[in-house]
Amino acid sequence: MDKFVIRTPRIQSSPQKKDPGGKIYKQATIESLKRVVVIEDIKRWKTMLELPDQSKENLVEALRELKKKIPSREVLKSTKIGHTVNKMRQHSDSEVACLAREVYTEWRTFIEKHVNRPSIEVRSDAKTETFRKNAQKLLSEALELEMDHLLVENIERETFHLCSRLINGPYRRTVRALVFTLKHRAEIREQVKSGMLPVGTFVQTHKK
């Protein structure tokens, strides 16, 4: 007897009609919420604001990111980010000063109204911090600067940020590449130290 394959037509489900008046909701990550504060990000933006000869573009970027967050009183005290933003209100550039005033006023108003309301803090673990301290040590030696220098901190924090805040292969390789360049390329080292070569650009071009 011959065998036949009988193909039955597929039943296509009718597409659901979209409600023209319905709202489209965008899924939010926990870190995008205003009261969820990643301590590492706060410290990174702080070093961007405090680094001498910082470009206006970077200052505005840091302040705009800070405007998206409302740190608790405890975070403001431990990181001293409030003092840094307060100083930026007197910046010579009107746009930077205006943005700093907006951030400072919003934070102060919220803290006064919600004095006992904590924010959610996200911190790095001890092992991660140990690896990062070692990276800062290598960078400081390559830059011929003290380990607690703002430039050293800024370069390491930018590297950590670009590597998704993970101590992984890309982070280690990027740190090694940065250290090698700073040690063996005197002209680039001086450009980084003088501010002619922005930290973000320097790190991005060496990301592995």
From Swiss-Prot:
Question: What are the entry keywords?
Answer: Acetylation, Nucleus
GO cellular component entries: nucleus
One GO term of the biological process aspect: DNA-templated transcription
Localization, per the record, is: Nucleus
Where, if anywhere, are coiled coils annotated?
Answer: none
Domain (TFIIS central): residue spans on this chain: 131-208
Q: What is its main location?
A: nucleus
Q: Where is this region: Disordered?
A: 1-22
Q: Modified residue N-acetylmethionine is at which positions? A: M1
Residue ranges occupied by any TFIIS N-terminal domain in the UniProt entry: 40-114
PANTHER family named among the record's database cross-references? TRANSCRIPTION ELONGATION FACTOR A N-TERMINAL AND CENTRAL DOMAIN-CONTAINING PROTEIN 2, TRANSCRIPTION FACTOR S-II ZINC FINGER DOMAIN-CONTAINING PROTEIN
What does the sequence similarity comment in the record state about its family?
Answer: Belongs to the TCEANC2 family.
The protein's name in its UniProt record: Transcription elongation factor A N-terminal and central domain-containing protein 2
- Which organism is the protein's source? Bos taurus (Bovine)
Q: In the UniProt record, what gene is named as encoding this protein? A: TCEANC2
